[in-house]
Amino acid sequence: MAVAAPRKTEYEAIIGLETHCQLNTASKIFCHCSTKFDSDPNSNVCPVCLGYPGVLPVLNEKVLESAVKMGLALKAKISPYSKFDRKQYFYPDLPKNYQISQFDLPIVEHGHLEIEIADKPSDPPVKKTIGVTRLHMEEDAGKLVHAGSDRLAGSTYSKVDFNRTGIPLLEIVSEPDIRSGKEAAEYAQELRRLVRYLGIGDGNMQEGSLRCDVNISIRPVGQEEFGTKVEIKNMNSFSAIQKAIDYEIERQIKAVETGEPIYQETRLWDESSQRTFSMRKKEGSSDYRYFPEPDLPPIEVTPAQLEKWAAELPETPAQKRERYETEYGLSSYDTRVLTDDRDVAEYFEAAVAAGADPKQVTNWVTQDIAAHLNKNVGLTIVELPLKATQLAELVNLIHDGTISGKIAKEILPELLEQGGSPKAIVESRGLTQISDTGALEAMVDEVLAANPEKVEQFRAGKTKLQGFFVGQLMKKTSGRADPKLLNQILAQKLRG
């Protein structure tokens, strides 16, 4: 079997992401139309978002607030003065033939986002800072629905749904600091966590609430000059982002090594074939003929607004991860699992605040409760019948010796389905742990007397038989024996 020759040149990828985050405001960015997803086509429209002559846009202040809060969370510079611009191009889903966006004076500049990369979930993560060039506000375009194909090319006809037109977006542009598909996917996920923690959007990629375009080029390691940049679109999951980038890196390296040209173009990721293919030549910013939006006044962020919005910022996922490690002694893996979803983090903190041991709560949340939520697709931890205070009660019943871990596991399914007080369930069913030394000694004597041959075998060196005796005793006590005390008594009596 032939072995591929090693590459003579080592290459590195230069990657930047343009991320569009759809905001969850009740109304659109420049009019009062609803932003409700899944409404009947063209039902959430008006003369403003359809671009009729003689109408004037008015900025939704919640959009400005969301942009500033996101900028603060990215530790960026907030511009006290900025403006809107018209980005002009033609497409069937753009009724005005221009998009209101921001060009040379964005609301946010010069931020950064720290990501954590681990080869394996159990490995300690490596932290890396990704620069954020800018964040700006803009309106979304409509949505094309193609008949006979999932794209315009090949379709017999297309319908336009303008409900999405005018939905507020934040476009977040990273520096070209990303070097792999894995880093890009983690950067996008950390952005989504921030969006959700701030409460400004849901970040659902499947619904288009979070969309990422990738700009990627390669160059030999050590070379300062960038290679030809290619844009990739049509990735609707984090795994698709990673796979598309990994594929494109290999495609570009192969092209360079075989002397094929790399064109500055837009390529689409095709999930079914797991490859990218050319869509069109890449447009430069000059093609859009930007100029200031004459129908909107300049934007001013006052010191009072900035102070108010900064005071309302929640603890970020990164801040929580750091605090959980230092305050509770949790592993980096556990902190990442707990903080991936804000509701899970708040559930964990509520259980700890109710007096439960943080590490024990972590085990229950990341294992048993997580398994239950995964099994019941659509169920969230907020809707879980077992409330955080009840989980704390269960953990404390184990901690103070009232019940064993085995009993806790037995009553957990009922608690997950119906909720209720673990203590009340234990008391009503007589499930309290047997911790009376005299009672346990009598039971041990009975079991040993009923199995004299195995006792002799144990004393002759077959010490693994202790597990047999423990099993018999747990069966005898219906799992209610204090395991630690039981093992102490059993070991003492087996030694004779």
Swiss-Prot record:
Q: What is its EC number?
A: 6.3.5.-
Cite a single GO BP annotation.
translation
The record's keywords, sorted A to Z, are: ATP-binding, Ligase, Nucleotide-binding, Protein biosynthesis
Entries under SMART domains matching the protein: GatB_Yqey (SM00845)
Tell whether Protein biosynthesis is among the UniProt keywords: yes
Q: Per the record, what are the reactions this protein catalyses?
A: L-glutamyl-tRNA(Gln) + L-glutamine + ATP + H2O = L-glutaminyl-tRNA(Gln) + L-glutamate + ADP + phosphate + H(+); L-aspartyl-tRNA(Asn) + L-glutamine + ATP + H2O = L-asparaginyl-tRNA(Asn) + L-glutamate + ADP + phosphate + 2 H(+)
Checking InterPro entries in the record gives:
Asn/Gln-tRNA_amidoTrfase_suB/E, Asn/Gln-tRNA_Trfase_suB/E_cat, Asn/Gln_amidotransferase, Asn/Gln_tRNA_amidoTrase-B-like, GatB, GatB_C_1, GatB_Yqey_C_2, Gln-tRNA_amidoTrfase_suB_CS
Q: Which Pfam families match?
A: GatB_N, GatB_Yqey
Q: Does the keyword NAD apply?
A: no
Record-level Gene Ontology MF annotations: asparaginyl-tRNA synthase (glutamine-hydrolyzing) activity; ATP binding; glutaminyl-tRNA synthase (glutamine-hydrolyzing) activity
Q: What does this protein do?
A: Allows the formation of correctly charged Asn-tRNA(Asn) or Gln-tRNA(Gln) through the transamidation of misacylated Asp-tRNA(Asn) or Glu-tRNA(Gln) in organisms which lack either or both of asparaginyl-tRNA or glutaminyl-tRNA synthetases. The reaction takes place in the presence of glutamine and ATP through an activated phospho-Asp-tRNA(Asn) or phospho-Glu-tRNA(Gln).
Family to which the UniProt record says this protein belongs? Belongs to the GatB/GatE family. GatB subfamily.
| Assembly notes | Heterotrimer of A, B and C subunits.
Q: Name the chain's protein.
A: Aspartyl/glutamyl-tRNA(Asn/Gln) amidotransferase subunit B
